[in-house]
Amino acid sequence: MLETGVLVIGGGNAGCAAAIASARHGARTTLVERYGFLGGTATAAMVGPWMTFHSGGDRIVGGIAQEIVERLMAKGASPGHVADSSDYVATITPFDPEVHKAVLFEMMREAGVELLLHGYFLSTETVGDGVTGATFATVAGSRRYQATVAIDATADALVAHSAGVPTQQGDERGRVQPASLMFRLSHVDMHELARYVREHPDQMRTSLAPGQRKAAALTAVAGLNEIWQAAVRDNIVDVPRELVSIFASPYADEVIVNMTRVVNINPLDPDDLTRAEVEARLQTMQLLDFFRTRVPGFANSRIAATGTQIGIRESRRIVGRYTLTADDVLNARQFDDAVARSAYPIDVHNPSGSGTTTKRLAPGKSYEIPYRCMVPVNREQLLVAGRCISTTHEALASVRLTPTVMTLGQAAGTAAALAVRSGSMVGEVDPAQLRATLEADGVDLRRT
């Protein structure tokens, strides 16, 4: 058995931020990831751009998340935060997933995080109410770790579920949001697309005047309704989407396509997950044909990359010491133990068909997420970070976005390191001390 101070299971964006924060605060930290790279949905599923670091004109996400963006910018792999030309959020943050993988490895080395890649979680070890370690499958057999604190950053609450933490899934009928496989198209003539949306001003959701719709300004295009509906009628596509949804990448002739949709799935059922992967890749080929034959500027486009796996919006959520609700989100609620802020709307993609329901905060407002959402109701020395924290189905539709989960990860790693240093339980970490430490590390917890 190997020993560590803080054991982070899952090397996605939440897990990476947790491991970096923990190690920077002096805890011996081990991160175990199932793939041969880090980044989770941002790299394995290529989910991007990141949405959103801002509420109106104010940046509300900082810390490690902002540091990652600045490192990507320094490598020419992100333009930083740019205005969302589709008016869905204030800003979006395009990035290159391949460079993001390398940036995360650099940050792990600098912080002194011990890595185990290609490690597949099998089970937890508990003593009384405490989680004391975990076992993983590796190419050389099983490997056990004993830890003072464990952080579940698996996105599916695998560790918490194994440890007997109560969980919930989906809406009141158990339905979860659909899954989507992201892909990138290169060799795109953005000037031709811009010309089309200038000449057809009602075919794009935007506040940009037609004359402002230049290629460089089109960071996101949502619409092209007439083109899409005609393709559906002509049986070019059979995808349960209501509009075209594409985003600019860091590179001038490339776009990110977020349009595949596999409905009626349970992402924790391996057969459903298999079906979703197959259906999404077949949808991708339909969409490639659609773009080449119907959308101006895409005649010579090629698939530059697809996600290693399909993107999952929702699976398990733990029951924590507090459950964040839709009312908390929409009313911009504040908490004494808040560790993160977000202004992303509640957007629920229809679990069984096309359409998306969106509920927004008041302009310029943001809500807070309390530390208690990461602390299981019945276990000690275990924290949960990422989309599987304690929320309702609707609240999760806002919380799940990458900038937010990176901040939650930083909070979890910081709290774990504080607990190791003081010899306390994670549920006993002083919220005021945690908040002060996070703010000193660049996390924006200001109140407006």
Where do the PLM segments sit?
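N-terminal Rossmann-fold NAD(P) dinucleotide-binding loop
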Residues: 15
